[in-house]
């Protein structure tokens, strides 16, 4: 174990030189005894054995490195550092550690941030702190030096003093790709057009006849201008969707008529032409596996799916199409039909209406009833029983409504004329007596109307199945009484037809949307707009 003196550099140096001298003496002594011992001592294999014979101090000296040829350069201002290597270093980790003195008292003290918030100090800044006051003479000298440098040195000139800024670049019109000599004073605008060829809407007759074979109205979706007035049968194929779904080569155009605007039939559709056509619509000539073969329009003439069209059944198609067009569509109003078909089936519809009283349900004014909704009941059996029949009844009633419009028109005119003459005669003879009698009649009619509405509303309420017979009997008696009165009035109208003095008011078509179909009814005046059947539908049920 070495002491502190051995650790000093001077002690190590003196010890090194003494050991080196002793080593040289021993080597000389060993060389005199024999060369073999020196060689064995120099080999690395037996160098350890030779060292074991020496003292432990000798072993430590052998491990020391040899001295260097050049001395290490040291800092002359730190000559005393070599003597202080055995002492603690100056740059110790705890030398610059901040030491906080212990608190002299344990009382509460405010922090500096809290003190600044509680009692802030008013610090008034000096006036010269914000504005700068340079020396004008010094600033002028500096500016002169800066300007002299930028003027004398070879640098890019400033854009402000550039002479090109004053001269405007004016291009000649001849240098442009589009010359404006022809259109001087006009301003043009670029726009995209569909084709380079532009035709006016009204063409000369010769050009129109030359372009007629190339006209394809079914691709354009419609025609306009003179083409629309001169083209024959082009309105049939004006639907692009029909052109995509079906093949219209087998369609036979039966006729085309202009719809006559009359006060009896006021339609909501803007369609002005009535076109009748028959045929088989399909995608291809064979029709197998196509969309047209699956469509019910293909079987319009009653032919099987695989039967080809030979063109010999045009008469049969025409008859079937007329029969199909007689029935109005539940979606489109019946005004789309031609007046010829309506007049041809008036008598047949009246006879069928008399046979089926329960389907017509005519009111006291001779107009068809508007209540087409089925009876509402809480029983699911009744709903399943009358679901199919209710739809058939709606379609049948729609047929009656569409065919009974013309007779009801003349019938209402006759009734209004008769009532008008009776009222004038009664007013001239006995005004006071008739006023009392009219009040009594109004009270009686109101009581009868309330009774009818009560019975009809009770039929629509949630009642047991046992009351259905009584309700159906009352409804049948009511419809029979109305139909009997209708027959008597019609017989009188056939015998004597009084002249029309006052023209009838314009009819307004009403459409019901609660039953799922657009149902129509004709109203003579505003006073007759409240129908008994509609009042029955809106009256709540009070029967227990």
Curated annotation (Swiss-Prot):
Q: Which UniProt keywords apply?
A: Cell cycle, Cell division, Cytoplasm, Mitosis, Nucleus, Phosphoprotein
Q: Residues annotated as region Disordered?
A: 28-55, 348-391, 422-480
What kind of modification does the protein receive after translation? Phosphorylated by aur.
Q: Where is the composition biased (Polar residues)?
A: 30-55
What InterPro entries would the database entry show? Aurora_borealis_protein
Q: Write out the annotated subcellular location.
A: Cytoplasm; Nucleus
GO BP term, example: regulation of mitotic nuclear division
Domain of life of the native organism: Eukaryota
Any idea which GO molecular function terms this record carries? Answer: protein kinase binding
List the disulfide bonds in this chain. none
Low complexity compositional bias, start-end: 450-461
Compositional bias (Acidic residues) spans? Answer: 422-445
Major subcellular location class: cytoplasm
Q: Which GO terms describe its cellular component?
A: cytoplasm; nucleus
Role noted for this protein:
Required for the activation of Aurora-A (aur) at the onset of mitosis.
Quote the subunit structure annotation.
Interacts with aur.
Q: PANTHER family of this UniProt entry? A: PROTEIN AURORA BOREALIS
Q: Which family does it belong to?
A: Belongs to the BORA family.
What is the name listed in the Swiss-Prot or TrEMBL entry for this protein? Protein aurora borealis
The organism named in the record is: Drosophila pseudoobscura pseudoobscura
């Amino acid at each position: 174990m070495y002491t502190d003196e051995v650790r000093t550099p001077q002690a190590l140096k003196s010890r090194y030189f003494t050991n080196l001298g002793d080593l040289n003496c021993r080597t000389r002594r060993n060389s005199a005894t024999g060369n073999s011992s020196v060689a064995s001592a120099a080999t690395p294999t037996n160098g350890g054995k030779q060292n074991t014979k020496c003292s432990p101090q000798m072993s430590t000296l052998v491990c020391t490195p040899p001295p260097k040829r050049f001395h290490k350069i040291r800092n002359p201002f730190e000559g005393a550092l070599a003597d202080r290597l055995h002492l603690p270093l100056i740059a110790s980790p705890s030398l610059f550690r901040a030491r906080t003195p212990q608190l002299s008292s344990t009382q509460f003290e405010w922090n500096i941030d809290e003190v600044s918030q509680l009692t802030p100090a008013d610090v008034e800044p000096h006036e010269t702190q914000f504005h700068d006051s340079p020396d004008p003479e010094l600033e002028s000298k500096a500016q002169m030096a800066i300007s002299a440098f930028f003027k004398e040195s070879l640098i890019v000139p400033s854009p402000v003093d550039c002479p090109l800024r004053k001269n405007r670049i004016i291009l000649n019109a001849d240098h442009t790709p589009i010359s404006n000599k022809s259109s001087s004073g006009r301003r043009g605008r670029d726009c995209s057009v569909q084709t380079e060829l532009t035709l006016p809407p009204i063409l000369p007759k010769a050009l129109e006849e030359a372009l007629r074979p190339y006209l394809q109205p079914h691709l354009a979706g419609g025609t306009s201008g003179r083409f629309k007035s001169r083209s024959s049968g082009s309105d049939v194929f004006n639907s692009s969707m029909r052109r995509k779904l079906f093949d219209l080569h087998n369609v036979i155009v039966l006729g085309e008529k202009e719809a006559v605007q009359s006060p009896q039939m006021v339609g909501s559709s803007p369609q002005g032409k009535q076109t009748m056509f028959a045929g088989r619509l399909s995608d291809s000539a064979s029709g197998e596996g196509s969309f047209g073969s699956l469509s019910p329009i293909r079987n319009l003439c009653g032919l099987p799916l695989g039967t080809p069209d030979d063109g010999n059944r045009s008469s049969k198609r025409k008859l079937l199409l007329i029969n199909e067009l007689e029935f109005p569509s539940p979606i489109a109003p019946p005004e789309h039909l031609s007046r010829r078909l309506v007049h041809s089936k008036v008598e047949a519809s009246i006879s069928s209406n008399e046979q089926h009283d329960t389907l017509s349900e005519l009111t006291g004014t001779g107009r068809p009833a508007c209540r087409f909704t089925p009876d509402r009941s809480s029983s699911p059996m009744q709903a399943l029983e009358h679901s199919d029949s209710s739809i058939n009844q709606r379609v049948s009633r729609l047929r009656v409504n569409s065919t009974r419009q013309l007779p009801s028109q003349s019938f209402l005119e006759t009734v209004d004329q008769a009532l008008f003459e009776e009222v004038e005669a009664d007013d001239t003879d006995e005004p006071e007596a008739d006023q009392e009698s009219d009040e009594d009649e109004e009270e009686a009619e109101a009581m009868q109307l309330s009774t009818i509405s009560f019975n009809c509303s009770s039929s629509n309420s949630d009642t047991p199945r046992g009351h259905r017979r009584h309700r159906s009997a009352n409804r049948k008696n009511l419809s029979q009484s109305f139909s009997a009165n209708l027959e008597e009035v019609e017989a009188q109208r056939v015998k004597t037809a009084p002249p029309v003095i006052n023209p009838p008011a314009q009819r307004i078509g009403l459409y019901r949307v609660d039953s799922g179909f657009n149902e129509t009814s004709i109203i003579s005046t505003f006073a007759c707009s409240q129908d008994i059947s509609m009042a029955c539908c809106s009256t709540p049920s009070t029967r227990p």
